[in-house]
Every structure is written in C-alpha cells, then in structure tokens.
Amino acid sequence: MALQTGEPRTLAEKIWDDHIVVSGGGCAPDLIYIDLHLVHEVTSPQAFDGLRLAGRRVRRPELTLATEDHNVPTVDIDQPIADPVSRTQVETLRRNCAEFGIRLHSMGDIEQGIVHVVGPQLGLTQPGMTIVCGDSHTSTHGAFGALAMGIGTSEVEHVLATQTLPLRPFKTMAVNVDGRLPDGVSAKDIILALIAKIGTGGGQGHVIEYRGSAIESLSMEGRMTICNMSIEAGARAGMVAPDETTYAFLRGRPHAPTGAQWDTALVYWQRLRTDVGAVFDTEVYLDAASLSPFVTWGTNPGQGVPLAAAVPDPQLMTDDAERQAAEKALAYMDLRPGTAMREIAVDAVFVGSCTNGRIEDLRVVAEVLRGRKVADGVRMLIVPGSMRVRAQAEAEGLGEIFTDAGAQWRQAGCSMCLGMNPDQLASGERCAATSNRNFEGRQGAGGRTHLVSPAVAAATAVRGTLSSPADLN
C-alpha cells in the first residue's frame, strides 16, 4: 500500500490514506484512526485492566460497541452460566462496559448476537470505515467496502485509549471471480475453493479485494461470508467495493445516515472503488462457472475438495510439507484416501457462526429441510447469528420448519463454531459445519469438522452423509 501520490490507488489504499493521523514515512508504522471498535468478552478484560492501571478513560465510547457472543449458552439463557470461566468473562464485560460507558448488548437483548452479525445489522458497519475487533474474523465487515481487521488484546487497549492504531501498510491482492455461479453453488463454496487454491498462507500480509461479476452478483450476506474467511487464507483483511447492493442493505438501518447525511455519505461511498490502472501486488483468478459445492477433508480450511471428489492421497502430493500435513490430518479425521466425500457419515450438523448465521443462510437451510427429517443418529443445531436474526426467522416461519425436521433451534451466539461454550462435539464425533475453522479440537476436544455451505449442511443432516440438495432428489 502507498501514501497519496496522485497515482491510481486500490480501494484499500484509498481508505488507508483517508485515515492516516501521522505518517511513519515508510520507516515507522502509520498512526491510523479507527472509526468503529467492536468488543466481546474474550479479548477485552486485560485491555480494560490496562486502562485502569494507567488511569485512562475510553477515548470515544460512542464509537465502541460490545456484545456477548463467544461464551454464551444458546439454551436456558435466563439461567446463570454454568461454566465458571465463561461466567466470569461475561460478568467482567458487563462491569467494564458499565464503568467505561460503552454500549453493551447482553443475553436476552434483541440486538445481542455475534459481534460480526450485530455490527452490520445495526448499520454501524459502513463503507470507507476502519473497523477493528479483538477477533480474527473482523474481516467480515470488509464486505461493505470497509478496512476491517482483527487485533490483539494490547491493541484493543490502545484503541480504547486513543481511537488510533499504529500499523504498517499491507500488500494488496485482487481475487477476480468472473462468470455465472452454477445452481447450488454459494459464496461459501467460492471462498473454500479459493483457500484450497492459494493455501492458508496465500494471502499472508495482504488485504484482499474480491472483484468480478460473480462477486458483484452476491448479496451482502454472501459477501460477508467470503470476507469473513479471508483470514483463513492468511490475509489481514478482505473487502468488496460498495455498490447499490451495499446501499440497499444499509438504507433504513438504526445507525445508518439519514436525510442530507445519507446523501453526503453516498457521494463519498461512490468514490470507494479501485482506480483504473491501480496495481495490486498479487492477482488471483477463479472461474465461477467451474465451481461446485466444496467441503473440507482435513484440519485446516485449505484442505478442501469438491463434494463430488474423494479424499486425496497424500502419497500423490509432491511437496513434503503438504504430504506430511495431509497424513497427519487424515489420521486425526480418521479418513482413508480414495473415500468418496459423499460416503462420509456425520454425527452432527452445525448451522450458524459469523460465517453463515444470517437470515439468508437460514432461509437456504429451511428450503432444504421443508417437509424432510433430520436423519436418525444425527444431531443438528441451528443457531442464529443474532437475536434479531432469530426474530426474523420466527416471523417467516423458519423456526417451525427447523423443529418439525428434528433440528434444535437455538438462541444466538457463537455456539459450536468453537469449544468455548456448552455446544461442543464429543471426542471422535464428526460434524458438518457452516463455520470457518476445522482445526483439531476446534469444536471440542477430539471433534472432527468438515466445513460446508448452509445448503450442504442441510442436505447432510437429511441424508446423514456429506451431501448437496441435489442428492435428495
């Protein structure tokens, strides 16, 4: 990334330049102003302690939003949290927000939910913003044409105290996805295919801009899914230039501009596009028409294949590190090379997370489950990304479809995306999940995770093996 030079700039460079408080001149980090700081219970306690020790207040509490998501249960939310560590973290967040004057959406609040679902649904996430959170998947907000990234606890304290962050410029990458997506192929399949192509380190040190006709055709929910998993390709952030789809999503939301302020904002937002002639450090191309439903077989998001394929054979891999990683992954996943992905049976299906816990995702799942039943021996959890999403799903009759099918329809939270709350796999259980990480033990010690789209998750729940909706016909 570069400072203003009069030369064509990428979208990321434009936002960066607009937020420089003090330039490092290329020798030191730039001091970047932060427009929105999102906070949750896991990465914030030490940051608030640091403020107390230094006798500081939160610099811009009105630009800070907190919500409870990682540790919260998704059933019996009116009861005390059973796990003492989780309970302490949630109670600590509540005390800290009360003391420092930060708005908090707690369990039972209609706006409570996963932080990366709540920000956009409230209209707080807007084009051209810099957004940070002590959470890897902050890149989700880049779907709105924002520069959004996860930060560590010490950086959380710095932003709370100063509303700025010292950062070194990133490299830029363009991921061009052109063509028409085949029926049954979703945003989740695009990002899983990309990570399989470039690897979990392919985007390291870069901000990815997703471009092309296939990206432009996606809803905001689809764009958020793709930007959410940018970090799984090693990228610092992911983004999509704002357009009419973006503006339509934002219009009328609680914190979106209105009246003359909307008109002024729109003028700025419409300038947020990569200039003709701007040069990216790296470019990658995907043919949308060639994509199909994707699923992971291993223990990182890059270890994925089309659902129609088979478990790969490590002995056919020429790279030693790749082969050794594959052998280790297959041993953990208890899979044999050559096994058709569609033959792999699951014990559980999880629909939710900041990747795929929005209303559009739930509609897709409901369409597959309508008039069908979850297979015997399969436990299916459907967890909305926020209580607002849950209320909308209930209003549309989706909750009844889920429960009629035999799925568990839960309250909002991060749930089975990660083993920090009661929703976990038992050791040896296998799960098809719409979340973003399939690391060893991610969903519970010894649990085995296959990352899939909402459509594949729903079809898998019905058949009991990894499947797409086409397999149900």
UniProtKB/Swiss-Prot annotation:
Phylogenetic placement of the source organism: Bacteria, Bacillati, Actinomycetota, Actinomycetes, Mycobacteriales
Amino-acid biosynthesis as UniProt keyword: yes
Catalytic activity: (2R,3S)-3-isopropylmalate = (2S)-2-isopropylmalate
Cofactor(s) listed: [4Fe-4S] cluster
Binding-site positions, [4Fe-4S] cluster: 354, 414, 417
EC number: 4.2.1.33
Protein name from the UniProt record: 3-isopropylmalate dehydratase large subunit
Subunit (UniProt): Heterodimer of LeuC and LeuD.
HAMAP family (UniProt xref): LeuC_type1
